[in-house]
Amino acid sequence: MYMSVLILNREQVKQVISMKEVIQEVREVYRLKSQGKSVIWPLVNYEFVDEHAAMDIRSGYIKGVQLHGLKMLNNFPENREKGLPPFNGIMMVYDS
């Protein structure tokens, strides 16, 4: 048995949810956390000093709904000089 994986790009995500809705959902997760209904693990941050870059990983889950997620964000500040975006990242959401 195989599970399917759905990959969405930025434009596809924007068609599904607005930034205003994202902010509302993030607030809701923190509200659930204050009630003990979600868990947000400590931020993992690593600075690549020799490469002038950094990486952040944020993750957590909502209890009782078998929904887990993470966001990984890389920052390459020198990309601006190359005409590239300084930030890139990925969000992953897992359910059962």
Question: How should each PLM-predicted stretch be described?
Answer:
Residues 2-96:
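N-terminal ligand-binding/catalytic initiation module
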